């Protein structure tokens, strides 16, 4: 626990914490227990069943760290999770000027466009725990099954790190697979590599770890 996490406003705040307490990727191993303490959740912990980045049941385009460094979620997604994930994820994104702990900034996104709904919309849609809404995957709104209040990308980060929750993992991987429909729409309507064609869809693909450079 580090109370400075709750007061992060600048990149300098982030780098100070990373220098003091950040953990390198190589220090995370199967069997570790990860303690979660951030602005949205305190007191949650999970175990790493496998080593980070191994034994994946699907083939994402990029790792979470690569996605942050390339530009995702307006630079605003995990900035209070510095002590949960590898320090390299944040250092690399900071060096590339891709994080915005103050206000979200669309210009840091890979395609320079906004491509997501606000968290309040996710709650109303039943995509995150605590909403009570029963959508296509009612398990997602059940906090006993889904501990990831920030949605799919948070699940992906924890899955990549080595956490395994079979029921939740199956649902989130199926959602990832279903997102390929956007790739089909881009291929049907855009010339190959024309990044100015459907940039929002491309950014959305990227934020679900699919190839946006179709």
Predicted features and spans:
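Tryptophan-centered motif/residue detector
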Residues: 152-155, 176-177
């Amino acid at each position: 626990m580090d109370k400075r996490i709750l007061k992060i406003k600048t990149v300098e705040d982030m780098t100070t914490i990373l220098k003091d307490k950040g953990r390198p990727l190589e220090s995370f191993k199967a069997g570790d227990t990860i303690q979660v303490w951030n602005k949205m959740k305190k007191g949650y912990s999970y175990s790493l069943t496998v080593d980070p980045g191994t034994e994946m049941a699907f083939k994402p385009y990029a790792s979470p760290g690569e996605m942050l460094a390339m530009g995702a979620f307006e630079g605003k997604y995990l900035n209070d999770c510095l002590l949960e994930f590898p320090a390299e994820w944040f250092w690399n994104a900071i060096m590339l000027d891709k994080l915005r702990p103050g206000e979200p900034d669309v210009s840091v996104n890979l395609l320079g466009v906004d491509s997501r709904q606000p968290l309040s919309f996710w709650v109303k849609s039943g995509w995150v725990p605590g909403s009570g809404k029963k959508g296509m995957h009612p398990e997602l709104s059940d906090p006993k099954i889904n501990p990831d209040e920030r949605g799919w990308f948070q699940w992906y980060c924890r899955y990549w790190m080595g956490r395994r929750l079979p029921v939740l993992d199956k649902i989130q991987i199926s959602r990832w697979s279903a997102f390929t429909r956007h790739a089909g729409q881009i291929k049907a309507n855009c010339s190959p590599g024309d990044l100015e064609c459907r940039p929002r869809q491309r950014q959305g693909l990227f934020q679900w770890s699919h190839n946006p450079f179709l």
